[in-house]
């Protein structure tokens, strides 16, 4: 597909570009960047004057629920939600039914995405067979099938020797290991952050130590094995400190956090709102500050949504039995832009966190507008104001703690391989 994007502020940290430029895409790839570009007659054009033009945003942690849990979300609806949020690529986690632990399931997702998805869908395979934490999955086969990482997300690999072997094997074949880091014994029957609010509400708490101890284990295993590891959805002061210190001594560790962890505290649980129930849980104001500081100083490498759709029947129940997770694809960008408005990040940092870095971590040929690169582009209006309404969310599920919130900033065009797959109304 051919497309000319004219006059926008192009921000591409992969090339050190921050300038008003045109972007010309031909046959689905970036052909030229420059001022006053001419396109062949009949080429569609976007007037991006006053808008921000970036490499397509990448969410490296989503749950598309397909196969087996399509009543919550499927590849078609999840990709529509991604496109509406400005994401041109998503990596989908393997805790489906059946789980993504075989070439057949990975191939199913890739083939279905080719026919139904508006955006690029990259599967993440399981670390262990069946996601049971007992023996390693066939990582080589998963990589051959198109998986860009492995994870038992939803729960940790509890056996340290097994995790060590996973890191060593993954290093050998060049695939990213993504750790869901928590100590399940400490989590116990906890349903929210352990602290004043949990005590006041009479709910069992999950201590910050459950995350910190598990993150520390992964760091030491990666250091011992000389292998890279990526830590999913960090949320605590301690886990940020552990990763920061590990990076300083050369450990190959990367990590992500999610917008809810730098926006909401456990105060959001008051009223027993199950849309504020997630794993890891919402933490304290000090933890929010740690996430913002970690994003600013490079400790945290990526912003990922952990988009986790659930049917109303799984959320409209008592807090203790409600399932964990929220939808986040359509609210991630404005919540992240707020960090720019607050002066905690600049736009170049934000684009790195939401596009360039996720591409590097997963080894994707995305996250750049270099000539010859895939023509995936996000066009953003940072001043556009809108309200989060359940009826207007593209996701099949509506379990968001941000319903009713007034947002500022959103993607107005999402372009995949030169084709506009989303345009804001």
Curated annotation (Swiss-Prot):
Gene Ontology CC annotation, any one: cytoplasm
Cofactor: how and how many bound: Binds 2 Zn(2+) ions per subunit.
Residues holding Zn(2+) 2: 153, 180, 233
Residues annotated as binding substrate: 63-65, 95, 279, 310
Cofactor(s) recorded in Swiss-Prot or TrEMBL: Zn(2+)
UniProt: Zn(2+) 1 binding residues: 61, 63, 153, 306
Record keywords, A-Z: Hydrolase, Metal-binding, Pyrimidine biosynthesis, Zinc
EC number: 3.5.2.3
Pathway entry: Pyrimidine metabolism; UMP biosynthesis via de novo pathway; (S)-dihydroorotate from bicarbonate: step 3/3
Catalytic activity: (S)-dihydroorotate + H2O = N-carbamoyl-L-aspartate + H(+)
Active site residues per record: 306
Cited InterPro entries: Amidohydro-rel, DHOase, DHOase/Allantoinase_Hydrolase, Dihydroorotase_CS, Metal-dep_hydrolase_composite, Metal_Hydrolase
Gene Ontology biological-process entries: 'de novo' UMP biosynthetic process; purine nucleobase catabolic process
Domain of life: Bacteria
Molecular function in Gene Ontology: allantoinase activity; dihydroorotase activity; zinc ion binding
Function: Catalyzes the reversible cyclization of carbamoyl aspartate to dihydroorotate.
Family, similarity comment: Belongs to the metallo-dependent hydrolases superfamily. DHOase family. Class I DHOase subfamily.
Protein name (Swiss-Prot/TrEMBL): Dihydroorotase
Gene assigned in the entry: pyrC
